[in-house]
Amino acid sequence: MLYYFITSMKILKTLLLICLRLGLLAQSETSTLKPFVLGYIDEINSVQLGEKRILNIYLPEGYSKTDTTHYPVVYLLDGSYDEDFIHVTGLYQFNNFSWINRVPKSIIVGIANVDRRRDFTYPTTIQKEKDSFTTAGKSARFIGFIEKELQPYITKKYNAGGSKTIIGQSLGGLLATEILLKKPALFNQYIIISPSIWWDNGSLLELDSDILKPNFNQPLKVYIGVGKEGLAPSETPRIMEVDANLLVEKLKKATNKNLHVYFDYLPQEDHATITHQAVFNALRLLNPVTDKN
């Protein structure tokens, strides 16, 4: 009996030594790993919103605060690391490769969400929407945050140039459309994807806008992309593809020659899958590469 006990203890001791050595080996291997840094986390205290907001920042290769180079800025709604920040940043980096050279090196500002239903919607007259979106209707405050706090903050802290782009999908697309129609001068380029124009029974489509008038002289490029999305979650039946087309038709009626509108229908994508492909297409349409041959 004693013999078996001693033998078992020897086996156990041997196994423990093997596990310890394997653990030390794994620790040694992982200790040589270095973090892969894609961007930086910044914060801004907003008086307009009454809260602190997280910003995910991508700075292009070669960026230096002490340099005199200034970069276009892309403002990305739904810009958390677990939303659209990582893959959209990758698209801009890819399209900036020297053998592609479709977009210039750019600063990406991902605006992390707190309450997108609150921030991306204007007040609605539809009771069903009021009941379902109980915090909704504060987009004016969020637009004020972008205009009066965020853009000045980015301009002051980073080497931001004059060119500004906004990207928004779904309710983010609704907000981008509202800014386009109400405060178009905030951005030079608008990438609007699957906009939730059904909100408030499509009242945004009835809005008059300075960009439709001949005396609006700021050059604007607008991309509107939509997939095969079908019925919107609205009280009155609305089809999202139709609403997107109505927005395009509204903009193309403008007598303003400085407004350039690009419509993109992606029938192989739906509301959940469209963003990545649409942003890629938008960069191609808004920034055509001249023939190098």
Question: What kind of region is each of these model predictions?
Answer:
Residues 1-32:
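Bacterial Sec-dependent N-terminal signal peptides
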